[in-house]
Amino acid sequence: KMKQMFGKAPKVFRNSSLIYNDEIGAMVASMGFKGMLTEGAKHVLGWKSPHYVYHCNMNPNLKLLLRDFKLSDDISLRFSNSEWNEYPLFADKYISWIDAFPQEEQVINIFMELCSLGMSQPLSSNILEFLKALPYCAKEKGITFSTPTEIVTKLKSVSQLDVPYPMSWVDEERDTSCWLGNVMQREAFNKLYSVAE
């Protein structure tokens, strides 16, 4: 449908709440996608950095782009929080944080939902002015922007990423427990799956 309507076929997949595990990655790869966006969860990465391209351990053809949750949440959650120790956040300061990362780190992925603009961050917070200024401040530091498709096309994976259990960008746990964390949720989930079988 996308190809028919827009003349383009998507090459990178983004699941709701960035939910991912190895099995999901294998399914996404089998659908022909070349990359997938997911969370840079510490409990999965361990000592690894989210600033590199990884690949699915069940299909090395699927590259994984991991969200830098701190930098993403600085915009989507904390930007207008006057209690935050970095408030107010200006584009030049934000770009200086990105510029401070080691040169060898391949990519810094900033992912957020559009509902952050206007809901989590009211327009009165000057979020739009911040976003407009970002490319200019980045250009001054020699920092460039790329689409996910450009990244998975240009960059090689440095390693496979093993994710046996689902992870997401939700809550501190960065997993799916918020949806299956109590008896009622699990019962509804199991009923739904029993109907499918």
Regions from the PLM with identified roles:
Residues 1-17, 96-111:
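CE4/NodB-like, metal-dependent polysaccharide N-deacetylase domain
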Residues 8-16, 74-89, 118-125:
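The substrate-binding groove and active-site-proximal loops of carbohydrate-active enzymes
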Residues 8, 29-50, 54-63:
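Acidic, His- and aromatic-enriched active-site or binding-groove loops in soluble protein domains
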Residues 1, 11-14, 34-39, 147:
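Short, well-structured secondary-structure segments
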Residues 17-19, 39-42, 69-71, 114-116:
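Active-site-proximal loop/turn and secondary-structure-junction residues that shape catalytic pockets
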Residues 52-53, 57-62, 66-69, 81-82, ...:
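Active-site and substrate-binding clefts of carbohydrate-active enzymes
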Residues 13-20, 41, 149-152:
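Short, solvent-exposed turn/loop segments enriched in Gly/Ser/Thr/Pro and often Arg
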Residues 21-29:
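Distinct, well-ordered alpha-helical segments
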